[in-house]
Structure formats: C-alpha cells, structure tokens
C-alpha cells in the first residue's frame, strides 16, 4: 500500500510539472492527450475537413476537441464514453457503453447514414499498478474497439488505437494487420518515456473492398 501511495504522489508531482499539461491548460484543451493525437495526425493526416469521426472513451474530451477543429463545420465528431463529458463545440456526445444495443441505436440515429472515416480509441482500464491485471484489461479494450471499428468504418476508413505493449499485444497487432491494408505503430513524443503505451494506426479497411 505504501508503495502505491508513493507512486501516486510521484505521478501527481510529475503531472503538474509536465510541460504538456501546462500547454494544454494554456491552449484550452482538456487533457495533455490532445498533443499525442496532434503528433500522430501531423504524420498520418487522419483528420481533415468534412470527415466523420467516432471517438471511443472520449472523456474528458481532448481528442474530440482537436478532431472538431480539424474536421470543421462540414465534418462530424461523435464522442462516446460511459463517463459523463462536458459539452464541446462541434462534438455530439453519447453517454453509454458502445456494446449495448440502445447506445448503438442512438449512434446510428446520430450518424443518419453518414459514412464513418475514422474510429479512434484512447480507452484504458483503471490501472491497478499490477501488469498481470492491467495488461489483459488493456488488450480486451483494444479488441472491443477493433470489433467496433470493423463494423462501423466505411470502405476506406481508418482506425487509431491506444494500447500497451506486453502480453497479448502481438496477437492484437496481427489481427489488425489482417483487416487493414496499412498498419503503423507510433510512440508520440507526448507519451511519457517509461509508459508502455503505443498507438496503432490502421488504414484502408479491406472489409468492403474484396479483401480478406
């Protein structure tokens, strides 16, 4: 218990001294995670005017903020989370578990037939500090996000997933490679150095293009 308290205290000290945290507050963003998305988007050009985006595990909304800025008035950003989220300009929010039928029905009504260009997931489990517990949970969330993306994306859609290196990562990565034509792994500078988190970018789903 003392070790966990010490770890939490260290994390808090680092968090409030973090230059990305300071920048996020100064620029009006809700979390430092926005800079990870910015860095990936700069390289991959996932977001652009008129695109339709679904943001899984969106709260507190940093990714949704950036996405709304990038897609503009002609685009759409639909944020989903089991947690509440404050309203955000240019973002439609659905609170609930995206596996549940009523939530999926609300999503379909919100999309109103629009083709989804990007599904992005910044979901992570509540960390216990025990890798044997946290890693399987993280991989499971990644599998859920992938299944959602496979069902939701348009024929040339893209998928952005935060996950963690460790047991189960290679298997998840291989499944993603089988379903998308181009897959890359990113470790953006805004990720903390000792963190095992990485971001998988998968593009051009083969689902509706005759691929396997």
From Swiss-Prot:
It catalyses: uridine(2552) in 23S rRNA + S-adenosyl-L-methionine = 2'-O-methyluridine(2552) in 23S rRNA + S-adenosyl-L-homocysteine + H(+). GO terms for cellular component: cytoplasm. GO terms for molecular function: rRNA (uridine-2'-O-)-methyltransferase activity. S-adenosyl-L-methionine binds at residues 61, 63, 81, 97, 122. Gene3D superfamilies: Vaccinia Virus protein VP39 (3.40.50.150). It is found in: Cytoplasm. It comes from the Bacteria. It is an enzyme of class 2 (transferase). InterPro entries: RNA_methyltr_RlmE (IPR050082), RNA_MeTrfase_FtsJ_dom (IPR002877), rRNA-MeTfrase_E (IPR015507), SAM-dependent_MTases_sf (IPR029063). Signal peptide: none annotated. The active site is at 162 (proton acceptor). Keywords: Cytoplasm, Methyltransferase, rRNA processing, S-adenosyl-L-methionine, Transferase. Its EC number is 2.1.1.166. Transmembrane segments: none annotated. Belongs to the class I-like SAM-binding methyltransferase superfamily. RNA methyltransferase RlmE family. Specifically methylates the uridine in position 2552 of 23S rRNA at the 2'-O position of the ribose in the fully assembled 50S ribosomal subunit. This is Ribosomal RNA large subunit methyltransferase E. It comes from Nitrosococcus oceani (strain ATCC 19707 / BCRC 17464 / JCM 30415 / NCIMB 11848 / C-107). The gene is rlmE.
């Amino acid at each position: 218990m003392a070790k966990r308290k010490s770890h939490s205290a260290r994390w808090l000290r680092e968090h409030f001294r973090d230059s990305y945290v300071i920048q996020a507050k100064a620029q009006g963003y809700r979390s430092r995670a926005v800079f990870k998305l910015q860095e990936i988007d700069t390289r991959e050009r996932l977001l652009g005017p008129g695109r339709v985006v679904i943001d899984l595990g969106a709260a507190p909304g940093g990714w949704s903020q950036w996405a709304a800025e990038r897609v503009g008035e002609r685009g759409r950003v639909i944020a989903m989370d089991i947690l509440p989220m404050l309203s955000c300009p240019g973002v439609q929010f659905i609170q609930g578990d995206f596996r549940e039928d009523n939530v999926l029905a609300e999503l379909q009504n919100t999309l109103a037939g629009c083709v989804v260009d990007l599904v992005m997931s910044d979901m992570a489990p509540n960390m216990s500090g025990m890798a044997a517990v946290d890693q399987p949970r993280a991989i499971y969330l990644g599998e859920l996000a992938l299944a959602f993306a496979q069902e939701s994306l348009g024929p040339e859609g893209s998928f952005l997933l935060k996950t963690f290196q460790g047991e189960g990562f290679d298997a998840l990565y291989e499944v993603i490679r089988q379903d998308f034509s181009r897959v890359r792994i990113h470790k953006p500078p805004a990720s903390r150095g000792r963190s095992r988190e990485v971001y998988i970018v998968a593009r051009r789903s083969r689902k509706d293009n005759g691929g396997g």
